[in-house]
């Protein structure tokens, strides 16, 4: 199963000082306070089973491969889901965007200023990708991410010129 809209709030950290090394990511699936992730996966598997038993699907089935016929209770389904759940395609939202100095209800602070996409406390560093999105759209996010990138490019172009002169004081 794919955790498309997990309510778990994971974390991202650097694995080494090597800038080419991939970062470490812990998505923290199934760790949300209200149990949403677990309910979503368990119910999703139950619904998939019901759909598979309807014609015309049923006539093509030989047997259920995963999670398998022995996996029937909510507890067993949850255990299975926890062992195989993963993110598909587009992890995002690792750089909280908002108004600087504002903390969210969970105490996390803003990393990127929403008005100019600048990293809080940095003069000329902007983040213009999916990491500033608080949630992903339900469709492929390519156009949304493209829009963020276009806005970032517009802001950079605007800042590159002051009174008709190209800035040199970056």
Predicted region positions:
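FAD-dependent oxidoreductase catalytic-site/capping-region signature
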Residues: 1-144, 152-170
């Amino acid at each position: 199963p794919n955790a498309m809209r997990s309510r778990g709030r994971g974390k991202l950290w650097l694995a080494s000082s090597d800038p080419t090394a991939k970062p470490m990511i812990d998505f923290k699936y199934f760790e949300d306070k209200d149990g949403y992730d677990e309910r979503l996966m368990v119910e999703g598997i139950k619904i998939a089973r019901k759909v598979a038993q309807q014609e015309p699907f049923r006539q093509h089935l030989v047997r259920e491969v995963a999670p398998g016929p022995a996996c029937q209770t909510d507890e067993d389904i949850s255990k299975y889901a926890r062992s195989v759940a993963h993110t598909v395609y587009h992890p995002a939202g690792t750089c909280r965007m908002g108004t600087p100095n504002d903390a969210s209800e969970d105490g996390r602070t803003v990393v990127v200023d929403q008005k100019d996409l600048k990293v809080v406390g940095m003069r000329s560093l902007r983040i213009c990708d999916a990491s500033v999105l608080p949630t992903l759209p339900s469709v492929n996010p390519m156009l949304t991410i493209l829009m963020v990138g276009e806005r970032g490019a517009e802001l950079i172009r605007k800042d590159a010129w002051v009174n008709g002169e190209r800035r040199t004081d970056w």
